From Swiss-Prot:
Name under which the protein is recorded: Phosphoribosylaminoimidazole-succinocarboxamide synthase
Gene name as annotated: purC
Enzyme class, first EC level, given as a word: ligase
Highest taxon of the lineage: Archaea
Family classification: Belongs to the SAICAR synthetase family.
Pathway assigned to this chain's UniProt record: Purine metabolism; IMP biosynthesis via de novo pathway; 5-amino-1-(5-phospho-D-ribosyl)imidazole-4-carboxamide from 5-amino-1-(5-phospho-D-ribosyl)imidazole-4-carboxylate: step 1/2
Length: 238
């Protein structure tokens, strides 16, 4: 009997099983904001996010960070390792922006003296609430696992922040997801792209990420292209 493998489709990506160990991660051209209430499609967005994720995953692997990236299966498709995912979104913040403005009496653009790490329970029905170590324990995630996840997240931040600074880009904040591999090791998953990071131009503080779409600041594809061109020195191929 042929074993049917479930395809999972989210707002921005589609996960297509290859076998028991690998998946195709297909990046879509869809953009959403405000819990999916604002939607649009942008030709080339999926390609740009896929290619930028490849660059960042390779960079992190070079610095000893284990990621789920295996290879490229096409312009907007990556081959990734199948993991047992944690129901967490891990946010690292270097600069006050977004929802942090509502929780701290500090102005937007304030550079934090050290990074802030936040944990969110990944659940659409509950709108991804912020949680702490105690909540994580109830969800079956041990303190040791959380500490390891935070340690990796901070190392990722250090690597990406320094790399992007050389390209004239401020890494304001970003979201990461993690899973466990077959050996029980914690592995970085999902994507690293302008969809999941806040990037600002170092001189003008201009947004070069999904905030361009979220707050109608300009042309989303032009912003994503600019990130790609600054990092690679090349024009995108889509």
């Amino acid at each position: 009997m042929v074993k049917l493998m479930e395809v999972y489709e989210g707002k921005a990506k589609k996960m297509i099983p290859i076998d028991d160990d690998k998946l195709i991660m297909e990046f879509k051209d869809d953009a959403t904001a405000f819990d999916g209430t604002k939607k649009a499609r942008f030709k080339g967005k999926g390609w740009l996010n896929a290619q930028l994720s490849v660059i960042f995953f390779k960079l992190l692997e070079e610095h000893g960070i284990k990621t789920h990236f295996i290879g490229v299966a096409g312009g907007n498709r990556l081959i990734v390792e199948k993991l047992d995912m944690y129901p967490l979104e891990v946010v690292v913040r270097n600069v006050v922006a977004g929802s942090l403005k509502k929780r701290l009496p500090l102005p937007e653009g304030y550079e934090l003296p050290e990074p802030i790490v936040e944990l969110y329970y990944k659940n659409d029905e509950l709108h991804d609430p912020m949680i702490n170590y105690y909540h994580a324990k109830v969800l079956g995630i041990s303190l040791d696992e959380i500490k390891k996840i935070e340690e990796i997240a901070l190392k990722v931040n250090e690597i990406l922040k320094d790399y992007l600074a050389k390209k004239g880009i401020i890494l304001v904040d970003f979201k990461l997801e993690f899973g466990k591999d077959k050996n029980g090791d914690i592995v970085l998953a999902d994507e690293i792209s302008p969809d999941t990071c806040r990037f600002w131009d170092a001189k003008t503080k201009r947004s070069l990420d999904k905030d361009v779409f979220r707050f109608d600041k300009g042309d989303l594809i032009e912003a994503y292209k600019e990130i790609y061109e600054r990092i690679t020195g090349e024009k995108p191929e889509f």
